Regions:
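A short, glycine/Asx- and small/polar-enriched loop/turn
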Residues: 77-83
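A conserved beta-strand/loop element that lines the FAD pocket in flavoprotein oxidoreductases
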Residues: 59-73
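Short beta-strand to alpha-helix junction loop
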Residues: 37-54
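Trp/Phe/Arg-rich N-terminal binding region typifying the photolyase-homology
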Residues: 36, 66, 75-77
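A conserved beta-strand/loop capping segment in the N-terminal third of enzymes
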Residues: 11-40
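Flavin (FAD/FMN)-binding glycine-rich loop and adjacent Rossmann-like elements that form
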Residues: 1-9, 15, 25, 46, ...
């Protein structure tokens, strides 16, 4: 998946600093994609510290006023028109006036508190996709680890001839020995920029409500507990990881799904699978539909396109019904739970955010 615009600029700047590998050089079925053979094509391995630095530099160059350590509290409304927001920081409450507000909270917090209709997760099934605590390991003998994969390729778990997961042979062994008290049946190990570093996407915390602080607190603590258990299993069983070190867990729990705003257009999974590109598309994307946990805690689904090579996300998905001067960006745009499984990841949400910013600027400029 290659998306241009600001995403491309961010990636290029990270590469210049030695902190990323260009997605055109990264293919599926490789260590960078955990050997997954469906979806996960053209991903971008990067260093988190490099990304932080690049984003700060770009914001400074664009003369953006940034307020870290500041939390949205409630919208300022005049009828159905949003005129700004009340925020809170160590300095107390503050009112920020705005001609256009962009809700990039990931949970449609602004839209929801302004009165916009929202769907929570998958309403039909009464579930949301599970949360994950990413973590990073280093000091791995990658040649030894990759040799183990090569030796076990005939043991890959395949569905319709396609590999969806790896290292399940070691997970099964660990479970037999009482070292894996966990419902996942495989490991997601993704090679990083440096040869000895890997990112682990395996933990799974079900039923997390990303709009509730108690639920988020539980998820973060449970995620770290799971990361510790997974790391100990990796160190004990996976060849090349005998001397590995757990470098860091993510700064916050990884949320896949919460609210989906009701917008002027609702992106459906068939729009994606049929390669639909509406006239008002604000981006095109080729990412597969990636749904975790819909059929129980062990399930993973990858749905790829039936027609074409890419699909479009219409501008109407960013425009919530009933509320004026408000746009929504990120995973909480107007989309079904299944469709959101494709556009919730980093490159698409960056493109959606850029589109929302351009639309807001144009609306102000053109009155």
């Amino acid at each position: 998946m290659i998306i241009r615009g600001l995403f491309e600029e961010v990636v290029d700047r990270m590469i210049e600093k030695g902190g990323a590998i260009h997605p055109s050089e990264v293919r599926k079925k490789t260590a960078y994609t955990s050997w997954i053979e469906k979806g996960h094509d053209h991903v971008t391995p990067f260093k988190t510290e490099t990304l932080k630095l690049v984003l700060d530099e770009m914001l400074e160059e664009a003369r953006v006023k940034v307020l870290y350590h500041t939390t949205f509290v409630q919208p300022v409304l005049h009828g159905c028109n949003i005129k700004g927001a009340i925020v809170f920081s160590k300095a107390g409450f503050e009112k920020i006036n705005a001609k256009v507000v962009i809700d990039a909270t990931g949970d449609a917090d602004v839209a929801y508190r302004a009165g916009a209709a929202c769907e929570y997760g998958n309403n039909q099934l009464g579930i949301v996709q599970p949360a994950t605590m990413f973590f990073h390991i280093s000091n791995v003998d990658s040649a030894k680890l990759e040799a183990d994969i090569e030796a076990n390729k005939d043991n890959f778990y395949r569905k319709d001839g396609v590999n969806y997961r790896s290292f399940h042979w070691w997970v099964e062994k660990a479970r037999e020995n009482g070292d894996w008290d966990f419902e996942r049946t495989s490991l997601g190990l993704f090679k990083g920029v440096d040869d000895d570093e890997w990112f682990v996407n395996t933990s799974r915390i079900n039923g997390v409500d990303a709009t509730n602080n108690e639920s988020l607190t539980y998820a973060e603590r449970e995620g770290r507990k799971q990361a510790d258990m997974i790391f100990r299993m990796i160190k004990k069983y996976v060849p090349g990881c005998e001397n590995a070190k757990l470098t860091e867990t993510a700064s916050t729990i990884g949320i896949r799904e919460s609210r989906h705003v009701e917008g002027d257009y609702r992106l459906e999974v068939d729009d994606i699978l049929e390669g639909e590109v509406p006239e008002d598309s604000i981006m095109v994307c080729a990412n597969s539909v990636d749904i975790h946990g819909r059929f129980g805690p062990k399930s993973n689904e990858y749905l790829t396109m039936r027609k074409g090579e890419y699909y479009g996300v219409p501008y109407g998905c960013l425009v919530p019904k009933k509320i004026e001067n408000l746009l929504v960006a990120g995973r909480s745009i107007s989309a079904s739970s299944e469709a959101a499984g494709a556009i919730r990841v980093t490159p698409p949400v960056m493109a959606i955010g850029q589109a929302a910013g351009v639309a807001a600027a144009l609306s102000i400029k053109e009155q």
